Amino acid sequence: KEFPGISITNSNVEAATGADIVILAVKPWFMEPVMRELKLKSKQILISVAAGISFEELAHYVVAPEMAMFRLIPNTAISELESMTLVAARNTNDEQDKFILRLFSEMGTVMLIPEDKIAAATALTSCGIAYVLKYVQAAMQAGIEMGLRPKDAMQMIAQSLKGAAALIQNNDTHPSVEIDKVTTPGGITIKGINELEHNGFTSAIIKAMKASK
């Protein structure tokens, strides 16, 4: 076998039987029939990747509602091992929490948060990645209009975003601190920032995030 110790099956029941950890990565509307079919045991750990399905709802679908449960919300950057993955836990202990966080940290950054913060955090991470890409798209259009080739413009913007993220992550600084370093009096950057604000940039971002909650 190419991957010794790994079994593949088309049967959900067969896959879950005897498993220590069961990961349910199905659409929310499939969750109830799949859960009813599985009849998970209290000693198993359930991980749900279905958005919008609360622990309370999951508890209704399982035979043992006291079982350890995790809700996981990754974003599409998981395909590049750069996901910002949100994790909420119920009926778990420290050892289980640490194991799950370590497991999914292989695919990016993980953060354990209370379940009641999941909706707000999802707006920033899962939805937010689309808003960042929308900025990339708009900036590319500006670059093309100013005479740059599309591929060059995209590379410039993507690397600039990567660098901006590194500045605040590696130095633990606030974005405003890094912005101040670039905005010299009467310079081109402050003119551009003022133009963004005159056109409601900050307000639009806040409204988009709140609309996605």
What are these regions (language model features)?
Residues 57-68, 84-121, 131-172:
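Internal alpha-helical scaffold of NAD(P)-dependent oxidoreductase catalytic cores
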Residues 158-213:
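NAD(P)-dependent Rossmann-like dehydrogenase/reductase catalytic/cofactor-binding core
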Residues 15, 31, 149-156, 178, ...:
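Small-residue helix-packing motif on alpha-helices
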Residues 3, 11-87:
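Rossmann-like NAD(P)(H) cofactor-binding subdomain of soluble oxidoreductases
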Residues 124:
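Alpha-helical membrane segments and immediately flanking helix-loop junctions
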